[in-house]
């Protein structure tokens, strides 16, 4: 059994997310977070011979699984890289508009459960945390050079950790004596500086989340890909996003709201909302969360939220089209 296959992964909101795409047999779809291919395989089962599925992932282990799938199914195209390169990657594959795009954000179970990746404080391993281990600075490398203020801001903003300043100060003091290069070392520093304990949560949880999000630019990539998808969706095409914490869900929620709902008009306005131009997105249903049965089978699904939007015939504001070029 390969390293890519040794860690069990249960796809969250599998049917709900793929149902939300309303897959057409001859459609072109994007799975922006392939992982181990749970969503992708269900999409493929609903595509006909003329359909196409493009999958993205940063993780070399996930890409190995995706490439194996692509060898046996010519409808699949594989992109090794972050989904922030959405439009550039599609251009390179000769693809214009798409019928739907799905994103299952955050970290996957295989990444958490593979102790060697350095994502989890449950294992003593090198402090890496990169989703793409072939490029970029590891968590240990960043912690070794970051200023106390930068450490504080990352832990506070991305981990919503109220003891961020104490933790940052302790990290700087400890690294002056010896490198903080393993998950256990970082977890111990955090535990010594978090004064209160949250029920059912390790004191290192928020700090590890914060460093991981920063190292992988997770929130920036979410903010970057959404306008690109909006520009590439055909009329009637669907965007489905599964988020696992409030920071990324807030980005998705605010984006969809901005492009699906007009700002309230002042009472003195001489125009009615019904007379305003159609906006480029419309919200499809309510945000969905896993049911009790799914949470019982997979406790990691507890915090998942699925939001869905559909492309309308409404024009896309020029400023949104310009923003996409920043990541091309």
UniProtKB/Swiss-Prot annotation:
<protein>
    <recommendedName>
        <fullName>Ribosomal RNA small subunit methyltransferase H</fullName>
        <ecNumber>2.1.1.199</ecNumber>
    </recommendedName>
</protein>
<dbReference type="InterPro" id="IPR002903">
    <property type="entry name" value="RsmH"/>
</dbReference>
<feature type="binding site">
    <location>
        <position position="104"/>
    </location>
    <ligand>
        <name>S-adenosyl-L-methionine</name>
    </ligand>
</feature>
<keyword id="KW-0949">S-adenosyl-L-methionine</keyword>
<feature type="binding site">
    <location>
        <position position="111"/>
    </location>
    <ligand>
        <name>S-adenosyl-L-methionine</name>
    </ligand>
</feature>
<feature type="binding site">
    <location>
        <position position="57"/>
    </location>
    <ligand>
        <name>S-adenosyl-L-methionine</name>
    </ligand>
</feature>
<dbReference type="InterPro" id="IPR029063">
    <property type="entry name" value="SAM-dependent_MTases_sf"/>
</dbReference>
<comment type="function">
    <text>Specifically methylates the N4 position of cytidine in position 1402 (C1402) of 16S rRNA.</text>
</comment>
<feature type="binding site">
    <location>
        <begin position="37"/>
        <end position="39"/>
    </location>
    <ligand>
        <name>S-adenosyl-L-methionine</name>
    </ligand>
</feature>
<dbReference type="GO" id="GO:0005737">
    <property type="term" value="C:cytoplasm"/>
</dbReference>
<comment type="similarity">
    <text>Belongs to the methyltransferase superfamily. RsmH family.</text>
</comment>
<dbReference type="Pfam" id="PF01795">
    <property type="entry name" value="Methyltransf_5"/>
</dbReference>
<keyword id="KW-0698">rRNA processing</keyword>
<feature type="binding site">
    <location>
        <position position="83"/>
    </location>
    <ligand>
        <name>S-adenosyl-L-methionine</name>
    </ligand>
</feature>
<keyword id="KW-0489">Methyltransferase</keyword>
<keyword id="KW-0808">Transferase</keyword>
<dbReference type="GO" id="GO:0071424">
    <property type="term" value="F:rRNA (cytosine-N4-)-methyltransferase activity"/>
</dbReference>
<dbReference type="InterPro" id="IPR023397">
    <property type="entry name" value="SAM-dep_MeTrfase_MraW_recog"/>
</dbReference>
<keyword id="KW-0963">Cytoplasm</keyword>
<dbReference type="GO" id="GO:0070475">
    <property type="term" value="P:rRNA base methylation"/>
</dbReference>
């Amino acid at each position: 059994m390969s390293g890519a296959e040794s860690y069990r992964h249960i796809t969250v909101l599998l049917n709900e997310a793929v149902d939300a795409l309303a897959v057409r047999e001859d459609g072109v779809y994007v799975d922006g977070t392939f992982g181990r291919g749970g969503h992708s395989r269900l999409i493929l089962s609903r595509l006909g011979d003329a359909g196409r599925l493009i999958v993205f992932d940063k993780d070399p282990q996930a890409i190995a699984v995706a490439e194996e799938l692509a060898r046996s199914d010519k409808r699949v195209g594989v992109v090794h890289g972050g989904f922030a390169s959405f439009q550039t990657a599609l251009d390179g594959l000769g693809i214009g508009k798409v019928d739907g795009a799905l994103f299952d954000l955050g970290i996957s179970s295989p990444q958490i459960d593979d102790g060697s990746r350095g994502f989890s404080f449950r294992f003593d391993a090198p402090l890496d945390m990169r989703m793409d281990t072939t490029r970029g600075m590891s968590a240990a490398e960043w912690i070794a050079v970051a200023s106390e203020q930068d450490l504080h801001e990352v832990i506070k903003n991305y981990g919503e950790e109220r003891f961020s300043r104490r933790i940052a100060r302790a990290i700087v003091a400890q690294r002056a004596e010896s490198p903080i290069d393993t998950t256990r070392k970082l977890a111990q520093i955090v535990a010594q500086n978090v004064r209160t304990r949250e029920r059912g949560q390790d004191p290192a949880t928020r700090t590890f989340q914060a460093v991981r999000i920063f190292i992988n630019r997770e929130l920036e990539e979410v903010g970057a890909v959404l306008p690109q998808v909006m520009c590439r969706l055909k009329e009637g095409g669907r965007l489905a996003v599964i988020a696992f914490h409030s920071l990324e869900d807030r980005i998705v929620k605010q984006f969809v709201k901005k492009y699906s709902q007009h700002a309230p008009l002042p009472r003195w306005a001489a125009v009615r909302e019904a007379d305003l131009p159609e906006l480029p997105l419309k919200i499809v249903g309510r945000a969905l969360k896993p049911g009790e049965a799914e949470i019982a089978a997979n406790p990691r699904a507890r915090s998942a939220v699925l939001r869905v939007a559909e492309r309308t015939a409404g024009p896309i504001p020029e400023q949104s089209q310009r923003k996409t070029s920043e990541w091309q």
